């Protein structure tokens, strides 16, 4: 099998993800947020920049809102908390209102 | 002189017949056997109760152990593994390049590609990446993905919070789906001298086709193909030809 590292036995015991698998987004409810995130990553040469991480946060929020992910605090996902003045709006909405 | 009989205080076994001695011995033996039987019954019943208790306790104990260690392939859900302090990015000069590659089994008629070639992350910084899968066949198919990480020594530091691997994913005929991976590199990566010279980590996913004994992993598509306007008109015309109009002959007779 190509890509399978054979040098280490530890690689033969893969660890499962902490929260299991994402449910499939059959209806494409969060595709818009994903496309914005991917566009942002292209602009910064795929560096995990803070503004792209905020778009990733919007995507995960969309999944939580559509029952495609369990609700959790942002600190448990390594993402910054919402700004106090946003009242839960996405960064894009806050930018549009300004 | 008055000859008074001496009262019998001692049990004189010599005066008993052989049969009476035999009966006494059997009586004693039966009493001992009864005691032993009761003792054994108590022991067995207590062992049974103990194992019944262990059986009831096994389910929560097993769940607790698996949540803590991931034993048996169960996803680790104990919060202590990925505590919040592990998700704080480490301030280092260089970023680690995470490259994404993919592969599909030859018997699985899917296309499966990463949406981005790479992402540069800091240890402890969570990152999101996307793959895209498309089912090219005319049947609903269940696939299952596994992953491998190169170099193998870095696999211990690659932590996936949520992805699409190790579970069956069903794609309807012709369906296209985005599949996210949410992960981070453990902050201990930065302080491990063995990881000093590792600048690249490759995350490789392979999709296989699921297989059931009764063949239900591949099913016929439930969606009916949509007809365009011309096809609908032709279909209606065919229906008109095949089903001529019924003439009520009684009208002609009355006229």
From Swiss-Prot, chain A:
A motif (Cx9C motif 1) lies at residues 30-40. Disulfide bonds join 30-62, 40-52. GO terms for cellular component: cytosol; mitochondrial intermembrane space. GO terms for biological process: metal ion transport; mitochondrial cytochrome c oxidase assembly. InterPro entries: COX19. Residues 1-25, 76-98 are annotated as: Disordered. It is found in: Cytoplasm; Mitochondrion intermembrane space. GO terms for molecular function: copper ion binding. Residues 1-10 have a biased composition (Polar residues). Residues 27-70 form the CHCH domain. A motif (Cx9C motif 2) lies at residues 52-62. Keywords: Cytoplasm, Disulfide bond, Mitochondrion. Present with 5750 molecules/cell in log phase SD medium. Required for the assembly of mitochondrial cytochrome c oxidase. Belongs to the COX19 family. This is Cytochrome c oxidase assembly protein COX19. It comes from Saccharomyces cerevisiae (strain ATCC 204508 / S288c). The gene is COX19.
């Amino acid at each position: 099998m190509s890509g399978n590292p054979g040098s280490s036995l530890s690689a033969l015991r893969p660890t499962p993800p902490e929260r299991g698998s994402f449910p499939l987004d059959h209806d494409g409810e969060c595709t818009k947020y994903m496309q914005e995130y991917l566009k942002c990553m292209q602009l910064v040469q795929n560096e995990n920049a803070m503004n792209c991480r905020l778009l990733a946060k919007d995507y995960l929020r969309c999944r939580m809102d559509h029952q495609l992910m369990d609700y959790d605090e942002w600190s448990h996902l390594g993402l910054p908390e919402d700004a106090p003045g946003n009242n839960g709006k996405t960064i894009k909405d806050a930018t549009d209102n300004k | 002189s008055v000859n008074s009989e001496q009262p019998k205080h001692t049990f004189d076994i010599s005066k008993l017949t052989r049969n009476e001695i035999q009966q006494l011995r059997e009586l004693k033996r039966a009493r001992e056997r009864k005691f032993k039987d009761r003792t054994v019954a108590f022991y067995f019943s207590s062992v049974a109760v103990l194992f019944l208790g262990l059986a009831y306790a096994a389910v929560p104990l097993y769940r607790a152990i698996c949540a803590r260690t991931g034993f048996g392939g169960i996803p680790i859900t104990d919060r202590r593994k990925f505590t919040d302090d592990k998700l704080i990015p480490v301030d280092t000069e260089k970023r680690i390049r995470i490259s994404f590659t993919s592969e599909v089994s030859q018997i699985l008629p899917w296309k499966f590609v990463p949406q981005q070639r790479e992402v540069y992350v800091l240890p402890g910084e969570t990152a999101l990446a996307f793959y895209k899968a498309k089912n090219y066949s005319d049947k609903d198919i269940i696939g299952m993905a596994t992953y491998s990480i190169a170099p193998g020594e870095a696999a211990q530091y690659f932590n996936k919070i949520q992805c699409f691997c190790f579970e069956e994913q069903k794609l309807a005929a012709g369906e296209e789906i985005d599949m996210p991976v949410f992960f981070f590199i453990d902050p201990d990566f930065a302080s491990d001298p063995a990881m000093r010279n590792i600048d690249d980590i490759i995350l490789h996913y392979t999709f296989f086709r699921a297989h059931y004994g009764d063949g239900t992993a591949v099913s016929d598509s439930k969606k009916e193909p949509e007809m365009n306007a011309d096809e609908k008109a032709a279909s209606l015309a065919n229906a008109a030809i095949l089903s001529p109009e019924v003439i009520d002959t009684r009208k002609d007779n009355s006229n």
